[in-house]
Regions:
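Short, structurally constrained coil/turn elements
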Residues: 9, 62, 115-117
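Conserved active-site "lid/cap" helical segment
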Residues: 30-65, 70
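Short glycine-rich, Thr/Ser-proximal phosphate-binding strand/loop in the N-terminal lobe
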Residues: 3-44
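Short beta-strand-loop/turn "lid" adjacent to the catalytic site in phosphate-handling enzymes
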Residues: 57-102, 120, 128-129
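Glycine-rich anion/phosphate-binding loops
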Residues: 45-52, 98-106
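A generic structural motif
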Residues: 19-24, 64-65, 119
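Phosphate-binding/catalytic loop of phosphoryl-transfer enzymes
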Residues: 103-107, 111-129
Length: 129
């Protein structure tokens, strides 16, 4: 089973690909102040970060084909801890959330990549647990 894990943070985006329990790609993409300054809102970073994730995977010689994609959970309404399937409603909730943080992009990027790969997207223990 091949799993892509995406963890967007305030100054980096971490990307890992696992084949079963073995990591086959582990990267931390650093974002400079200058890079992020071009975006007045966190949500404007969506395409930028998604492209970086996909480029990192391609540069490692891996296909964008996964059995599952998991993103860092965003700042949703308070919910119990656990694993959640990402859907369009969740993406909309995190994209339009009043509290913005880069982690909000995790479920959206996961959903977009998973949709293209034909697999499910998940988040685990969102930051509001």
């Amino acid at each position: 089973m091949t799993i892509l894990v995406i963890n967007p943070g305030s100054t980096s985006t971490k990307v890992s690909v696992y084949e079963d329990d073995e990591p086959i790609l582990v990267r931390s993409i650093r974002h400079t102040v200058e890079e992020l300054a071009q975006f007045s809102k966190i949500t404007q970073q969506l395409d930028f970060r998604r492209r970086l994730v996909e480029d990192e995977i391609r540069e490692a010689g891996l296909p964008l084909k996964f059995d599952a994609v998991i993103g860092r959970g965003g700042l949703l309404k308070p919910i119990p801890g656990g694993v959640y399937v990402v859907n369009e409603e969740m993406c909309h909730e995190t994209y339009t959330a009043p509290r913005q943080h880069a982690c909000n992009l995790g479920c959206i990027i996961a959903y977009m990549i998973a949709k293209e790969a034909g697999c499910p997207a998940y988040i685990a223990d969102p930051g509001v647990v």
